[in-house]
Each structure stands twice: as structure tokens, then as C-alpha cells.
Amino acid sequence: MTRGRCAMLAALLWGCAAPVSPCGTGPVPVDLRGSWHYEGTQSSPSTATLSGTLRITSQPGQDFYGDLSVTETDVGSGSARDLSGAVTGCALDAASVDFGALFTVEAAARRHLGTVKMDVTMDSITNGTWVESGPSGPIASGTFKSARQSGP
């Protein structure tokens, strides 16, 4: 099984549970506060691209809070819709994050599982998978990446 398929399987299995928050009051393992450029793809049920801004406004310990605003564009039809909502998550350690984005037009949160990497200029890059689950299982899924635009 490829690394990507393993990550997607993990996201699908974990997607049925609520995001891990509150996750702890320990020290901040990685400072995520700031504004992030968010890019994503949706692979099911239809193909779409997502582009926008993830803002982490508060991080008391491992928990973090903010909002996500994106434009989702259907690859087939070209139709676009704006999505925005609250973000609640957890910095599991210095290299892993788990967060949910609850868009105001959707009934279920999109759960994101990602890795955080710091490059030589200390700009954080996050990559991972997301899944939106409903009562009968996964509704939509895809991948995402974020690069910090500004921060503390």
C-alpha cells in the first residue's frame, strides 16, 4: 500500500470521530498562529479545487482555534462556491496536527490530519488529508497543503 493510500485510509478511519480538541494543556509543541495560504483538492465524490486562507488566531497550549475561508471550484463544471467556518484543532506534537473546519453551509466538519515541517527560513508548511463524514460514512475527501504567510 502506498504512503498516500495509507494516509487517506487513516483519514477516513479517523474522520468518523470529532477532532482532537481539547487535547492538552502542555507547552506549545509548534506555534501555528498566523495566516496560512490554503490549497486543497477534493477527490470524491467529485473533483474540485479549494483555495483560500486558514487563520489560526489562538493557541493556548496544544489546542488551537481560528477560521478557514476557501473558494471550492468544481473541476468538471467550473462552478464555484465560497465556504467559511470555524477551525478547532490540536498540535499533537511538533510535526502533527489534527483539526476540523466546520463550514457554515455544511452539516459535518471536514477533519484534517497533517504534518508540519519547518524549512530553513522557519516558514511552516503543512500537508495532509481531509475527510468530511456524515451519519452513514464519508461524504467527501481530499488533500491539502498550507504555507504560512504571516505569524508571530
Place the predicted regions along the sequence by residue.
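Sec-dependent bacterial lipoprotein signal peptides
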Residues: 1-18
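Edge beta-strand at a domain terminus
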Residues: 20-24, 54, 80-88, 125-152
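N-terminal helix-cap/turn-to-beta initiation motif at the start of protein domains
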Residues: 21-37, 57-61, 122, 149-152
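Tryptophan-anchored aromatic micro-motifs
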Residues: 27-50, 126-130
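Short, solvent-exposed aromatic-acidic interface loops
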Residues: 42-44, 67-77, 103-107, 130-139
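N-terminal glycine/threonine-rich, aromatic-flanked beta-hairpin/loop signature
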Residues: 46-90
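Amphipathic hydrophobic-ligand
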Residues: 46-51, 77-84, 108-117, 138-145
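Acidic, glycine-rich flexible loop segments
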Residues: 91-124, 129-134
